[in-house]
């Protein structure tokens, strides 16, 4: 691979969206190629932890996907077929097994469950620093508190990247600007179709049933498709989140340059119907107090999938943006971009 790579971070590593992510990792996706990116990412965590010597905090609890009606049951059947085609180990389990793994669930609301043993959770900060340290081991450099002020292309196709700490002449630019992808793109005259959206999750106080189980019986990650909710254990409580249908676009006219490690004011009215479903299907959550509510922005592409590849009509300018499920997909996205730049095409059709 290429050794002379430089990462420029406008503030500190994890600034923007990474620091407040829930950290769930899974491989199921309606797009099989995205599932491949996710599976690669999860397997990569072991490698970067070993290379960097920095823990990623991976807890492979496994994960199940719950169907409450035949529509979602059929969807899970299709997902299992795709998983088998890709060599992934997903199997249907009984609702009795679901309750054994998560006694908080009321099984009367479900008719089927698909189990994936490699799902789990990671520490977002740990993963970010493990990536950075691993890249450094392999010859890359990264600079924090180095915002890019201008990007100017020379006649030979290379780029002058102007920062407050000095200038860099680069053969190519890869825009992986996250919340600031639009702003970085505009420096080169590129308007990217991505938009930050507000996203909520909450963490409950300790739940007696979880304290009694102990860490060795950690509850798996779970997804309820009809409810559009996801959940996992957090300490002795639970984390409950939703990709809300009534999500609010954030900073349509541009991400503030002084934004970094802030959260947004919760808008519980946007998720109260989702919370009601979660409380109904896991009654213990309704009885538990709420310890924390997180509302933070994530960047989405038009179809919810990452926007990856060379920008048409521009020489030596690439993007890896709109990666809203970064801790599931980032490793695979990085692999795809690296193959595309070095080999001329990626091994996965994106």
Per-range role (PLM):
Residues 2-19:
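Glycine-rich FAD pyrophosphate-binding loop
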Residues 36-39, 66-75, 114-137, 143, ...:
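Short beta-strand to alpha-helix junction loop
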Residues 59-63, 197-198, 293:
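Short Gly/Ser/Thr- and Asp/Glu-enriched loop/turn motifs at secondary-structure junctions
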Residues 114-172, 180-183:
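Helical element adjacent to the flavin cofactor pocket in flavoenzyme catalytic cores
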Residues 150-265, 273-284:
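Flavin-dependent oxidoreductases
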């Amino acid at each position: 691979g290429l050794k002379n790579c430089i990462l420029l971070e406008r503030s500190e590593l994890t600034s923007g969206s990474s620091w407040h992510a829930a950290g769930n990792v899974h491989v199921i996706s309606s797009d099989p190629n995205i599932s491949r990116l996710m599976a690669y990412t999860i397997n990569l965590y072991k490698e970067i932890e070993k290379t960097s010597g920095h823990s990623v905090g991976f807890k492979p609890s496994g994960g199940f996907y719950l169907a409450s009606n035949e529509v979602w049951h059929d969807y899970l059947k299709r997902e299992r077929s795709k998983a088998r085609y890709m060599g992934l180990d997903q199997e249907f389990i009984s609702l009795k097994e679901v309750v054994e793994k998560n006694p908080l669930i009321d099984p009367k609301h479900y008719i089927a469950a698909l189990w994936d043993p490699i799902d789990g959770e990671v520490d977002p900060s740990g993963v970010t620093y493990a990536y950075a340290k691993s890249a450094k081991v392999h010859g890359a450099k990264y600079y924090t508190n180095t915002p890019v002020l201008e990007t100017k292309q020379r006649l030979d196709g290379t780029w002058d990247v102007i920062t407050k700490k000095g200038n860099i002449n680069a053969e190519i630019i890869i825009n992986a600007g996250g919340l600031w992808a639009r702003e970085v793109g505009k420096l080169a005259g590129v308007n990217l179709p991505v938009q930050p959206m507000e996203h909520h999750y909450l963490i409950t106080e300790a739940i007696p049933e979880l304290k009694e189980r102990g860490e060795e019986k950690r509850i798996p990650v779970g997804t309820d498709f009809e409810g559009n909710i996801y959940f996992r254990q957090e300490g002795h409580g639970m984390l409950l989140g939703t990709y809300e249908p009534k999500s609010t676009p954030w900073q349509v006219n541009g991400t503030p340059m002084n934004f970094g490690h802030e959260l947004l004011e919760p808008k519980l009215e946007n998720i109260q119907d989702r919370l009601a479903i979660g409380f109904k299907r896991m009654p213990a959550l309704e009885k538990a107090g709420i310890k924390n509510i997180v509302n933070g922005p994530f960047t989405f592409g038009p179809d919810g999938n990452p926007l990856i590849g060379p920008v048409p009509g521009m020489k030596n300018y690439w993007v890896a943006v709109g990666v809203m499920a970064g801790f599931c997909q980032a490793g695979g996205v990085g692999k795809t971009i690296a193959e595309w730049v070095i080999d001329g095409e990626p091994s996965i059709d994106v």
